Every structure is written in structure tokens, then in C-alpha cells.
Amino acid sequence: MPALRTLLPHLGLFLCLALCFSPSFSLSNNESCILYDQVYPSDNLINASAEEVSGENTTYTVTVPVNDSVSAVILKAEKDNKPVGTWSGAYEKCNNSVVYNLTSLNNSAFQTNWTVPSSEDVTKVNLTIFIVINRTATVSSVKLEPKETSSLASTPESQTSAMTTAMTSAMTTAKTTAVATNSSTDVTSDNSTAVTTANSTAVTTANSTAVTTAKTTTMTTATTTAKSLAIRTLCSPLAGALHILLVFLISKLLF
């Protein structure tokens, strides 16, 4: 018992020290992945393009220009301060970032893939890239664009071709109809005019001929009838007697 009482103060002191230093330990472990002391903005040409749409996911290929002095590339994709998507390859997690330690470089560019659900609005995702050189990092941001499938990409062209064909056909039909209508109207007008003129001429000629013929026939008939009556009158016996009587009376009066 005396020995236990002697150890209790030391045990309590150890527990207090452990509680006091535990936050610093966790902070040290949490921040141990930070490989840089200073950060500078950069305009490095970072390329992030959607290369493949598989099922319900879209895979983006991220290309980062590097050289022999680059020791690590840190990538972070966040939306509303929360990590989005998954990264490929061998990396270490650091908070909401992934760290790619570059030990050997075979080319002047570092590539990795980032996969995200196709339903995710990538235009609202902040993709940040850190390039670490001698504990100094340059930071760049990339604007992501949604992947357009080939069917969607080819739709405007087919619609344009269909619309162009439809418009051309409609214009051709309209022109043909207009020309045909004008031609029909012209032909109808010409035919109507010709028929009307011909009919009018024929009617006028017929009427004139009929009237002239009727008048001529009537006058000729009347004249012939009058002459015939006169001849008949003169040639009758009564007319002869009257003629003789008239000659006798005239001779008496004269002589």
C-alpha cells in the first residue's frame, strides 16, 4: 500500500502531461505531410480534360508540367470545402489533398486520373494544384468543364443538316409553287383573254353579219316586192284600160 501511494502522484502527473501534449501530437501528425513553407501563385498551364465516361462515372486526366527540380505534386479537388472524387496512382493523403512524391521523372509532364460521378456538377468543383520545389510551392487553379458525349456532340450537326435540307426543300417547293402559280395564272389569263377576245369577236362578227344580212335581205325583199307589185299592177287589164283612158284624156285636153 505505501508503494502504491507513492506511484499514484507520478501516474497522475504522467496522465496530465499526456492530455496536455496530445493536441500537439495530433497536430504534428496531421501536418507532417506539408512539404512546403511558402506558396506563390502561378500561371502554369495545367490541363484537366474529361477523357472517358464509363457507366455513372467520368474520368478526367490531369496533366501537370514538371522538371527535375520538382519533388512533389499536391492535388486537391473540393466542393463546399469537402473532397470530391477519387485519384489514381500511388499517393499520400494530406487533409483534403493527395500528395504525389516524384522520385524519378521520365518526361516533362506528370499525369494522373481523377474520377467523379457523372451527376456531379464539376463546374462548381475547385481543382487546385501545388508544385513543390525545395519546400516552396506554386499554386494554380483549373476550371473544369463537363464531358459531352459523342451523341450529344453530333446532334447539332445532324439538326443543322436536317434544318438546312428542310429549309432548302421548303424554299425550292415555294419557288416552284410560285412559278407554277404564276405560270398557271399567266396561262389562264392569256387563255381567258384569248377566249374572251375570240368569243367577243365571234359574237360581234356573227351579230354584225346577222344584222347586215337581215337588213340587206329585208331591204332587198322589200324593193323586189315593190317592183313586182308595180310590174304586176302595170301588166294587169285594168291597168291597161286606165292607161288608155289616161292617154285619151290628155290628148283631148291638148288638142
Swiss-Prot record:
Secretion signal, residue range per the UniProt entry: 1-26
Annotated keywords: Cell membrane, Differentiation, Glycoprotein, GPI-anchor, Lipoprotein, Membrane, Signal
Organism (species): Rattus norvegicus
GO-annotated biological processes: cell differentiation; negative regulation of cell-matrix adhesion; positive regulation of cell migration; wound healing, spreading of epidermal cells
Taxonomy, superkingdom: Eukaryota
InterPro entries: PLET1
Post-translational modification: N-glycosylated.
Membrane topology of the entry: Lipid-anchor; GPI-anchor
Keyword Lipoprotein: yes
Lipid addition sites, GPI-anchor amidated serine: 236
Residues bearing glycans: 57, 67, 126
Gene Ontology terms: cellular component: apical plasma membrane; external side of plasma membrane
Protein name: Placenta-expressed transcript 1 protein
PANTHER family (UniProt xref): PLACENTA-EXPRESSED TRANSCRIPT 1 PROTEIN
Prodomain positions: 237-255
Disulfide bond entries: none
Role of this protein: Modulates leading keratinocyte migration and cellular adhesion to matrix proteins during a wound-healing response and promotes wound repair. May play a role during trichilemmal differentiation of the hair follicle.
Subcellular location: Apical cell membrane
